[in-house]
Amino acid sequence: MTKLNDKAPSLATTLAHLLRQEPELLSFDSARLANALWQRMADEKILTPRLSTPTNTQTYPYTEIVKAAAYLSHQSGLPGLAMTWLAQQRLIEIIAQCENSVIKDTYLADLIAGNTLSALAVSEPKVGAHPKHLNTRADKVGDTYRLNGEKTYVTNGLNAAFFIVFAITDVVDKRKQFTAFIVPKDSKGLSISPLHGFDALKPSTHCTLLLDDCELPDSHILGDIGKAFDDISKPFREYEDVMMLAPLAGAMQSLIDQLCAHDAELIANDNLGQLLAITESVEVLSSQAASQLEQANPHTNPISLIITGRLLVEHFNQTIKQLSAEQPLNDAIKRLIKDIEVLSNIAQSVNKIKQINLAIHYRQQELT
């Protein structure tokens, strides 16, 4: 991993200083999120590093954020922790940038202070997050909306104070129009259940939501009616695709460290050199992709960097699987191997589509 330079203060060095001074912040029950860590990061003004507030005018570029996320994942050995930090940053920005004063007045202060979390609820059972197949509806009844449907794989759902739920509010020319609703966890008609069979990426939690005539006033609408997919979901997915390379890079380095500490002879030098090279390459690709995301320039699309990074992680996983087969590994190492595999598989089908689109674009250019 990139060495941190205390003489050149950055987001990563500020985070490193905090964790060195208060190492207990990474010693928490893995079944729940590290609330104390979020609150202390908020105190140090690094919980939302891109969000300028009256008390915090210092903001950081995406390249600084991915470096800090890789460091957090490396030091904790918990890519789910860094994943949660990155996701919350973007969700908090969405709340902060919305024009709905009721939503901002109700939730923003606690989010920025690290006192609470939010959760994005888009995916549905058996169909994933593809808008064509989503079915959760929000029907207008008088001055309220009545939500019915089911959501799954809701990240941090068991720890969230509220959910950003996508629901169909109209169909125009056979295209479903989605609106985002703020649904408090104690809403009548909302049932929250742990996602059974999913045991990875702790301390993040995952759950399912059942909405059964869940009524909400129109003051709970986040953003424009019918535009949630284009305005919230697509930009969030682009952000997530780029930023999640960093927790992977940090976790991969943590796994190498733990395997070598567990058994110095487990990995031969040629294989170790390969794993280290892959990890460093993923970190570099993460930084380059983040830099392109910062530019928001259509001519500097980070898709190729993301695809390459994920292919490298896939090769890393295959090598680790071969090296660790039938080896007596401890629970922490087994958990980390699983976490890296699960995190790298998120949006794998979307990544495959991007590869195909690159090929199609190339062939079309060849014909012109």
List the model feature ranges, each with a label.
Residues 150-190:
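A short core secondary-structure module
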Residues 194-284:
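Glycine-rich beta->alpha junctions and the first turn(s) of the following alpha-helix
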Residues 79-102:
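N-terminal glycine-rich flavin-associated loop
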Residues 47-49, 113-123, 166:
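A short, Trp-centered hydrophobic/proline-enriched beta-strand micro-motif
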Residues 317-368:
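Glycine-rich phosphate/cofactor-binding loops in nucleotide/flavin-utilizing enzymes
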Residues 283-329:
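C-terminal hydrophobic structural anchor segments
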